UniProtKB/Swiss-Prot annotation:
Organism: Homo sapiens (Human)
Entry protein name: Putative uncharacterized protein MGC13053
Annotated stretches, region: Disordered: 30-102
Biased composition (Polar residues): 62-71
Length: 147
């Protein structure tokens, strides 16, 4: 199924992306997933697209060239998850860090928030990895509609 939306490329992200499945978050706040990635130069870009009609679905993340250091982030799903993502961004992302980025990942406004530093470390086992030569199919696991 073709996605009904096309997010713009986001700068300062790049090659190595690792996705962890699993879910966390309070009831009514949506389900979350964390992602770690290596940041690249300003010309680097990360392209995301949704597969499937229902959240959480899957994300295809296509990286470009360049890599420098590791960042971490989280995906907040659901109608309250989107609001939670914004609160998370405001509370923990230093405004002076140009590599801090926010990628809209759903029609309902849910976000994947990528930060240079994070104090949220609820990871599950590694699910999949991609390099500059590959494509990541980051499947949501352990949630309705996931696999």
């Amino acid at each position: 199924m073709q996605p009904s939306w096309t997010p713009a490329p986001v700068q300062r992200t790049a090659c190595n992306i690792t996705a962890w499945g699993g879910e966390f978050g309070k009831e009514g706040e949506g389900r979350c997933e964390q992602v770690a990635l290596s940041s690249g130069p300003p010309e680097g870009a990360l392209h995301a697209s949704r597969e499937g009609p229902q959240p959480p679905g899957a994300e295809n993340l296509r990286p470009s060239t360049g890599e420098t250091f590791v960042q971490s982030g989280r995906w907040d799903g659901g109608w309250r998850g989107a609001m939670k993502g914004r609160r998370h961004r405001q509370a923990s992302t230093p405004p002076t860090r140009p590599e801090s980025i926010f990628v809209p990942t759903a029609q309902d406004g849910a976000q994947m928030v990528c930060k240079a530093h994070t104090r949220t470390t609820q990871y599950t086992e590694q699910d999949s990895v991609v390099t500059a030569r590959g494509l990541l199919d980051a499947k949501r696991v352990g949630v309705a509609g996931g696999s």
